[in-house]
Amino acid sequence: FCGVNIASDSKKTRISFCGTANWTLLDKCESFLKEFFFRIKNRAFRPYLDLGFPVSGMNLREKLLKSFKQNKNLDTHIIIRKRRDSSLISKEKYKFEYWNNILLAPFTICVRGNGNFSVRFYETLALGRIPILIDTDCVLPLDNEINWHKHCIIIKNNTKPNRIVDSVILSINA
């Protein structure tokens, strides 16, 4: 992986994530209602838009992170934030923990949030780490010029979370 040292003292592969994924029942209901009304509005005013995928990726993120945490073959450093944590923790501490978490492990899980993209993907690359991109049909820049598979692990989101985790482990050990 392009000069990134993935060796560690542990026999397990270190993987990190820091971000929002822990939703309360109220958060899930709010997200469902927003998506429901968004889809109705788009069907009425923009019938040409294909919205086959969920508008929010938070449910996917939550399920995937649980699967990563439960896997005994990985040394996971996962900090799951609640939506309102940013108002409870100082901005400096919040950012420090986020950046430190990416630097802690050679691999960082990058799965979409509310949009079909991951800013964490670019931040991980900028910090010299390897992103594990869970691909939900997102478009990467310059994909006709850059072989992204040389710089990151890209796993299609077309199966169960446990199988995605297994695919990540196979890709790392290949």
Where are these regions (language model features)?
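Nucleotide-sugar donor-binding catalytic core of glycosyltransferases
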Residues: 1-117, 135-145
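Catalytic binding pocket for nucleotide-activated donors in carbohydrate/polymer assembly enzymes
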Residues: 97-174
